[in-house]
Amino acid sequence: MRDESGLLRVFMASKSDGYPVIYADAPLAIKNEAFGVSELIEINGKSDPYRVTAYRDEAGNLRIVQYAKFNKYWSLGSDSEIESSNPTEYVVFLIAGQSNAQGMGAAAKSPSVNPGIAYQYYGGNLTPVLGDPVGNASTGSAWPAFANEFYRRTGLGVVFIPAAIGSSGLAAIASLPANGGNGQNWSGTGTLRGTAIARYNDAISALESGGFAYRFGGVLWSQGERDARCLPSASNKITEQDYKNEFSNLKSYFSETFGEKFVWILSQTGGDDAGIDAQGLADMRRLQREIVRSTSGVYFGWNGAYNLIARGLMRSHDFPNDPDNVNRSHYSQQGYNEMGTAMAVVASAVAIGNS
C-alpha cells in the first residue's frame, strides 16, 4: 500500500499457515461517510476467500487497509494508528451480585472505551459507556475492560444492565442486618431479582426503540462474600446446601425471562485483606466450583481474585487511607481490569459459539 506521503509500505505477509502477519491491531472499520470514508475499493486476492479492502478518506488519503479471511478481520491505518468503528450488533449482559460486581476501584485507572462500543441501561436511560463509572458505582469497575476485550475478540458491542447491589446476599438470612447485611438479597423473598428483570425488560424496549440489533449474552455474576460470612465455618447462619439451593432458585427465576439456554459467567469470590472469615471464603470458593461443575450453562469467567492479596492488588493499593472495612474485600482497579478482561474472554467464546 502507499501511505499519505506516497511511500510504498508492506502492511502484512502470509506465513506458511495462511494467517497474516500485521503491524497494527485494529478493529473492523466502519463503511460510512460519517466516519470519513468516501470511497471503498475492494481487491480480490489470488486465493479466495482472501480480500483486501482500502478506504479513501475525505481528503483523498488512503487511510485503512483491511484483510479478511474466513470471517476473521485484521485492519490498520496507513500511519499504524488504531482505526475504530461502531459495531453493527450488540450483546446484552445483566450485571448482578454485590459490590465487586458494581466496582469499588479507582475510576481514573480504568480504561476508556471508544464511542459506540458499549452502552448501559441505567436510571431509565440508554447511554454510551465511555469509561467508568458504570451503573450505580461511583468508582472504577470491571466493565470498561470487559467491553474493550469483548469487542476486540468479536467485533460486537455490549450493552450492560447494571443491577448489582453492594453487600447484598443470595440467601435472605445472610442479608439480615443482624448478620452484617443491609437487608437486600437475591432470594425469592427479596426485591433484587424482580428489579433486575424489570430493568432488563425496560432495556430491551429502549434497544428496540433505538433500532439496535441485539441478542442476550447472559448474566455477569460476582457475589459470595456476604453469604460466605454466614456459612457454618464462619457465623453458622446458613448451610452450604442453602446457598446452592438459592443459586438454583435464582437461575430458574431468570430462566423464565431469558430462557433455559442463557449463561452465567461467574467471578469467583476472593479473600479478605484483613484475614477475617478466611475459612468461610475458602468454603464459598469451593461451593462455587461445585456449582460450576454441576450446573449447565454456568461458567467461571475469572478465578484471579484470591491471588490479589498476595500480589498486593486489593483496594488498599489504590486507597491506602480508606477504612479497612471498605478496603478488605474489594479490589484495586488493576484487579477489576483483570476481572473484566478475563470474563470477556469467556463471554466472547460463548457469543461466537465456542462454549
Listing of model-derived features with the role each one plays in the protein:
Residues K72-S355:
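Cell-envelope and extracellular/periplasmic
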Residues Y50-R51, Y55-V65:
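Right-handed beta-helix
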